[in-house]
Amino acid sequence: KIFDGNSKFDVSVVPTGNWRGMVMRTDTAPFDNPKVRKAVRLAVDRQELVDLVMGGAATVACDTPVAPSDQYRLDMKCPQDIKQAKKLLKEAGYPNGIEMVIHVSTKEPTWPTIGEVVQQQLAKAGIKAEVKMTPSKSYWKETWMKKPVAMTRWNERPADSALHEIYHSGAKWNESYFKNPDFDKNLSNARGELDFAKRKAAYQNAQKTLWEESGTMIP
């Protein structure tokens, strides 16, 4: 931004697959209910996060970890939908909303700001979120994959690696403890498929499943 308007510099913005997100453990109530998880994700205004946290220099991900430039990425629209979020919470048995604690740290400079913006957005859907700062030195050992809701970050990976390493039921770093047989099957089918169109369809079906049931909100 400091070079904008300066004729001495030619500024180019190149999309990458690096991302930050908020993880809900799918094995822990109330996030063990997919309707609750989707309600939380629907309550988030992703474009506002991109604008406020990244100064507009980011791409809305709609909860897929696949990079914007990846040939297997599924492009989706995911506008904030407070009405639907409230409806899903009611169907899940939480007509008055839920309470949650978002654990952040300065391990990643953007996490505290993401937490604060998400906190304000969730309130519109009746979700009361507390943002709790945790020690940076012990974040990966004592907070990540331990607390019900915590922040995460990943660098760009090929579609197959990103989907397997973060979401496959048997993956070591399945940080949201996500388990979905159809998702795993799509990944397996994609790896064994020689036809590009069919392989792409399998990877994109996996991403559709993440949009419906994922425990990870990727702005």
PLM features: residue spans?
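Periplasmic binding protein-like
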Residues: 114, 119-168
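Periplasmic-binding protein-like
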Residues: 13-24, 69, 171, 175-184
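Generic, well-ordered alpha-helical scaffold segments in large soluble proteins
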Residues: 39, 43, 52, 88, ...
